[in-house]
Amino acid sequence: MATQHFTNGSATDDGETALEHIIKSLETPTMKCEGTHFDSHVPHTFVIFGASGDLAKKKIYPTLWWLYRDNLLPKSTKFCGYARSKLTIEELRAKCHQYMKVQPDEQAKYEEFWQNHDYAAGSYDQRSDFVALKERLSSLESCNCSCNRIFYLALPPSVFERVTVNIKDICLAERGWNRVIIEKPFGRDDVTSKKLSDHLASLFHEDQLYRIDHYLGKEMVQNLMTIRFANKILNSTWNRENIASVLITFKEPFGTQGRGGYFDEFGIIRDVMQNHLLQILSLVAMEKPTSCQPDDIRDEKVKVLKSIPALTLDDMVLGQYVGNPNGVGEQREGYLDDPTVSNDSNTPTYAQGVLRINNERWDGVPFILRCGKALDERKAVVRIQYRDVPGDIFEGNSKRNELVIRVQPGEALYFKMMTKSPGITFDIEETELDLTYEHRYKNSYLPDAYERLILDVFCGSQMHFVRSDELSEAWRIFTPVLNEIENNKVKPIPYVFGSRGPKEADQKTSENNFKYYGSYKWIGKK
């Protein structure tokens, strides 16, 4: 059944399935928190610019299908793709098909989904093409009533300004709200980001803009606030008196896979650290907001970002992967072997930065951000490492407590602690209190990050989207070191494809009060 994708049909106390409960809540007009519902009976149109591209076929269209299939969109939702490529609906459908995960018993619903689609080919800078698009949207909506429109810009930065001007001048709904979803990159530095933000502010109100960072849609990232502020045992220790250091890690086991040309323009710092990892840091470190309203939360994120000094080169370790002669396939090729990358490129594929927060709660606690490609595993994890126990009586055998929030893969929350080894001796050992989602929540489906975020746009919740002042502070922190790296042509440290990364990164981590014991590996419950 289609509902198995979302909840496996688990029931609430009144007999509703969890999915039915969610659908009902989305249609409820009286909710305590902003952005938790939509008007199901008002027509909505979802317009995808860049509809023929990779992001659209791999993420956007599959996400829209999953939401449509599970009845999580307003009842009268239509979809329209727009790109330069001349495609029929059937050709567009064929491009997307392998990513849609359609089950045999969902075929009728899938046909219905595509019957609600249109597609228009046109340029991104010709006003006449946008006039034609407006006419197609009006025809698709086919009603003389109010209609809400969402515009998703899955586009390269080079066409961004012209497209947004044409949307504003020509394509907005006249009797309904309009919302614009924007994909990164949000500029290359503080200057280009401000230029883009000023341009958007001249066209749209901030409450119409949804700057998407898909990491903010991940289950464990969204869980950070609850972990912190709904548990006194953790909240009361969340400070410099108890926490020694924080390590936020993002690792990918693959290289650029022939797409290094795009990556080479931005590098790992802009691609991952300045956005995904810094957003996680802000949720870990921010003060308690006055409520769960989106702007109360984003206000606190901005406050903590303002307390972080700009990074310098001394705070960084930079690396670039080289081929592994003992590897197989792609592992034998280094970054510079990618034919789309310049032979003398100094672009880092690995970066580690140590950030400091100059406020009362975190003064002296290093926040270590590390990310890289072509490493030994796929993993995103937050490690909150506590200080050593004062007055040790266990002859140096006691290890630090550590709260570990595993973002991906295999969502989990576990707390590393010391216990007596079972048996007749009085030895101690490291173990964990473990909440592994796939075992504790067997009947629950964890939706893809894009599902959560696109649904948030329909509901009008900006809680998990980046505000312009957040973006400004992020670039203030990173622009000086990016300029220093590029102006001085800093050479990254070579590391072997499939390794942990440069050894210098582990040394820098140790210097910043994070102890890596290497004596214990979490494997999750069997």
From Swiss-Prot:
Molecular function terms from GO: glucose-6-phosphate dehydrogenase activity; NADP binding
Binding-site list for NADP(+) 1: G50, A51, S52, G53, D54, L55, A56, K57, R84, K184
Gene3D superfamilies named in the record: Dihydrodipicolinate Reductase, domain 2, NAD(P)-binding Rossmann-like Domain
Keyword RNA-binding belongs to the record: no
Keyword vocabulary terms for this entry: Carbohydrate metabolism, Cytoplasm, Glucose metabolism, NADP, Oxidoreductase
GO biological process, one term: glucose 6-phosphate metabolic process
EC number of this enzyme: 1.1.1.49
InterPro entries named among the record's database cross-references: G6P_DH, G6P_DH_AS, G6P_DH_C, G6P_DH_NAD-bd, NAD(P)-bd_dom_sf
Pathway linked to the protein: Carbohydrate degradation; pentose phosphate pathway; D-ribulose 5-phosphate from D-glucose 6-phosphate (oxidative stage): step 1/3
Catalytic activity, reaction form: D-glucose 6-phosphate + NADP(+) = 6-phospho-D-glucono-1,5-lactone + NADPH + H(+)
Highest taxon of source: Eukaryota
Residues holding NADP(+) 2: R370, K379, R383, R406, Y414, F415, K416, D434, L435, T436, R500, Y516, W522
Cellular compartments per GO CC: cytosol
Predominant cellular place of this UniProt entry's protein: cytoplasm
Localization of this protein: Cytoplasm, Cytosol
Family to which this protein belongs: Belongs to the glucose-6-phosphate dehydrogenase family.
Database matches in NCBIfam families: zwf
Main function: Cytosolic glucose-6-phosphate dehydrogenase that catalyzes the first and rate-limiting step of the oxidative branch within the pentose phosphate pathway/shunt, an alternative route to glycolysis for the dissimilation of carbohydrates and a major source of reducing power and metabolic intermediates for fatty acid and nucleic acid biosynthetic processes.
Protein name as catalogued: Glucose-6-phosphate 1-dehydrogenase
